[in-house]
């Protein structure tokens, strides 16, 4: 694996230099990733919610949030405070333990997945050598929480929503994993940092989107389905099943579903940017940038600037994808459940298998271009 800026190792080493033993330093590190994940993901969600409401308003020729802060930027905060103080109701015949555990199982894996996301030039909380596999494994836990929430609510609409969520997740998780496997095959690594490093050196031409155009579309469609974004929001289709598995929820439990949905959208966009859009890499190669600026490629200030701007590049790519997902909400109709399942099993699955086999063949035929 590449020697990047591993926050865990750097944090422990810094405390050791201050005279703190390694055991105590590791104990101090334990709550630190959780703090970073919660703060970063929550801020990201607040931005996405505000963007979605403003974009939705523009699509419908409305103003949108306006009074809570400048341009209504504090409206998501106001909504969050409102949900915190709303009454937490548990239906009389619901299973209270499963009813409470469902939202937790939906949110927790998504937050933990941020551990392996490199936000900048090798800037990652924990650089796992199986990082991308870790993300796929965690993403398979959330549907269990959705099914649990639907079953525990003792409501027919909630149960239908939970069953739809489970069926949808199973149908699209396999094509998504196969499209990621093609990237892993080219990168010869499951580390998210190694995957980005494999795309470096050639600017925009080195990004995996050009070598994996089919996988690019498979991943995008499957990610939208996993996030339950239109046109794949069947588990909570208001016109058909009220609010799906969320029907009986209120207060903070409802807020957890709401939070998990948007955190998952931002996470999927970040992973998408890492796999296909070069992560923190610039569209222009670093040597060309140094040549245009008339400085050495090894210049310390150039390295600092590019490392700092790398974080901005990762976030900009992710939010561009979020913008497209939000825009799709007002441009495409919702599909039927049979169309949803047919698309996953009869089209995306075989195409993703063919794409994987084709990638293996190209890797053998053109090892330089496809990571042989």
UniProtKB/Swiss-Prot annotation:
Keywords: Membrane, NAD, NADP, Plastoquinone, Quinone, Thylakoid, Translocase, Transmembrane, Transmembrane helix. GO terms for cellular component: plasma membrane-derived thylakoid membrane. The keyword Disulfide bond does not apply. One of its GO terms (biological process) is aerobic respiration. NDH-1 shuttles electrons from an unknown electron donor, via FMN and iron-sulfur (Fe-S) centers, to quinones in the respiratory and/or the photosynthetic chain. The immediate electron acceptor for the enzyme in this species is believed to be plastoquinone. Couples the redox reaction to proton translocation, and thus conserves the redox energy in a proton gradient. NCBIfam families: PRK06076.1-2, PRK06076.1-5. Belongs to the complex I subunit 1 family. NDH-1 is composed of at least 11 different subunits. This is NAD(P)H-quinone oxidoreductase subunit 1. It comes from Crocosphaera subtropica (strain ATCC 51142 / BH68).
